[in-house]
Amino acid sequence: HFGLFHQSFKDGVQNELPDPWLTAHSWAEKTDTVYPVELAGKTYSARLYKLAVTGYEGRTNTLNLFDLDTIDESIVHDGITFDKTDIDKNLTLFLYPDDSDEAGRRLRVYQQYLMVSAGAQLILAECAARGCDYHDLADYAAIQINDTHPSMVIPELIRLLGERGIEFEEAVEIVTKTCAYTNHTILAEALEKWPRAYLDAVVPQLMPIIEKLDALARTRTKDESLAIIDKDDRVHMAHMDIHFTHSTNGVAALHTEILKNSELHGFY
């Protein structure tokens, strides 16, 4: 609903206010399509909104957005302060909520999974509607993991394909062919990693899959620094992306060379 914040200054002091992105008069079209998303043992309904975007030569692209009907903008007070634990009301309020405390960091995990799960379900639904065979998903869809925020789409898509009768090994192959990853930082220490405890609490259905992916990655390299789950029980999202996508690049050619030659050289 809101961007990071609307910035203003008064008497030399910064003031932070909500920055509305979606309003009652926006072009986002509410649909009847909802997808179930399980978070911390509770099932939420992610509603699909469609936003038409003018495309090349007068054609139209569609931006698919997801929201919860229970979101309540009135819980925001004193600038951009809100209860970060009230997931029903806050989950899609702010883009990248403040993660300076544990509640904010967990909220980011909630947000990321809501979007990738609903998005993956939409992709598979559209695939089925067009007569696409799930085994050939990579011929139908391309999923670009833009920075590490959507990384959970890898285990989630494997999970969804498993529900549709596809064995783990083939699901991994399908997802790897379907997904590509763009890395946005040249500092290895800045790459997103989550304490396993967060994922155990918020998305326990993904952890068995992430464990299997980690075990598979370890058969490819003995370098512990390239593992998905490290010795401190942190899950490295970028490592999972690199191991289980078909392509990794930086945001520019020079950026890609830096990643290859230094920060991510072990993978190259």
Residue positions per predicted region:
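A conserved ligand/cofactor-binding region detector
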Residues: H1-Y268
